[in-house]
């Protein structure tokens, strides 16, 4: 059964170009602007960056009116509940397992 919202689907918004730490002005973080999913599916959100000396990825969840919440972090693949993080030198992805309507939020990555 597909989830319904005002847009007819659950949209996971992503904040673009978020950086935890910028070593130089040319360093950037890239994410897609939106990802759609259905209840029970697995959704994958990608994050690429150009920070040559980055050693940690951070994935955050943000609901309007609330402080961002750290979901998962590290310099190697890891899992925290329904959230899995993949890790490579210049990229990471966040997999959300068994997507629920309550997962509709802003997700963003940062590098350190």
Curated annotation (Swiss-Prot):
Chief location category: membrane
| Disulphides | 47-109
Positions of glycan attachment = 48, 84
Has the keyword Repeat been applied to this entry? no
**Domain Ig-like positions:** 26-112
Where does it localize? Cell membrane
Q: One GO CC term of this entry?
A: T cell receptor complex
Gene3D superfamilies on file: Immunoglobulins (2.60.40.10)
Q: Tell me the protein's name.
A: T cell receptor alpha variable 2
Identify the species of origin.
Answer: Homo sapiens (Human)
């Amino acid at each position: 059964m597909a989830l319904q919202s005002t847009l007819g689907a659950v949209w996971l918004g992503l904040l673009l170009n978020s950086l935890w730490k910028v070593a130089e002005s040319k360093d950037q973080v890239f994410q897609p602007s939106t990802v759609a999913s259905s209840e029970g599916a697995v959704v994958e959100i990608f994050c690429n960056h150009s920070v040559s000396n980055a050693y940690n990825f951070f994935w955050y969840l943000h609901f309007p009116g609330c402080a961002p919440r750290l979901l998962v972090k590290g310099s190697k693949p890891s899992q925290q509940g329904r959230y899995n993080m993949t890790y490579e030198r210049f990229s990471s992805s966040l997999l959300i397992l068994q997507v629920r309507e309550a997962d509709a939020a802003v997700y963003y990555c940062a590098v350190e």
